């Protein structure tokens, strides 16, 4: 298994194709372990936005708390796909005060980011997200409104 992880790390770090690097990030998110985690955190600086998105999502899958601060930096990135991936990953990672980090995304100009934020807030089981999720139920984008509705259902269940 170590050889396979090493091969994916090598591909992530040196493949010329951004798709190959992104695939490697996704695979490393399945394996975990310290070497994979270190490579994924490093990949957050890849020149390709596609690779950075894949690395962020993989770190979320791994619940990599050590990546929280780097992922939080993506929440203000000009690229909506990076903001959304960071929101999803941070929702999976959780932690103290994570809702307060994600709540400003309620007003993001990108519907995809607002939807990702709604999903993430629904995973955190934090009552402080209730008002924002209630407002997002009225979002003009139906996907965002649906994500907020589903998040509220999860939040209510977690608080019982």
Residue spans for each PLM region:
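Alpha-helical segment of the N-proximal tetratricopeptide repeat
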Residues: 7-31
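Solenoidal tandem-repeat scaffolds enriched in leucines and small polar residues
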Residues: 128, 134, 143-150
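Amphipathic alpha-helical scaffolding segments comprising HEAT/armadillo-like alpha-solenoid repeats
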Residues: 1-12, 33-45, 64-76, 95-107, ...
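Helix-adjacent hinge/juxtasegments
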Residues: 56, 61-88
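Short inter-helical turns and helix N-cap capping residues of alpha-solenoid HEAT/ARM repeat scaffolds
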Residues: 16-17, 47-48, 78-79, 109-110, ...
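Core register positions within helices of long alpha-helical scaffolds
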Residues: 27, 58, 89-92, 96, ...
């Amino acid at each position: 298994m170590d050889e396979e992880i090493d091969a994916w790390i090598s591909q992530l770090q040196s493949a010329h194709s951004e798709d190959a690097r992104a695939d490697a990030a996704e695979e490393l998110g399945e394996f975990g372990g310290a070497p994979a985690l270190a490579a994924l955190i490093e990949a957050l600086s890849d020149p390709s936005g596609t690779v950075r998105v894949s690395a962020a999502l993989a770190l979320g899958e791994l619940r990599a708390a050590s990546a929280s601060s780097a992922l939080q930096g993506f929440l203000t990135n000009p690229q909506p796909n990076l903001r959304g991936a960071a929101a999803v990953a941070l929702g999976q990672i959780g932690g103290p005060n994570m809702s307060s980090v994600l709540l400003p995304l309620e007003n993001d100009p990108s519907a995809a980011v607002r939807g990702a934020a709604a999903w993430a807030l629904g995973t955190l089981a934090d009552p402080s997200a209730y008002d924002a999720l209630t407002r997002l139920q009225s979002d003009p984008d139906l996907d965002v409104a649906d994500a907020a509705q589903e998040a509220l259902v999860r939040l209510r269940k977690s608080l019982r």
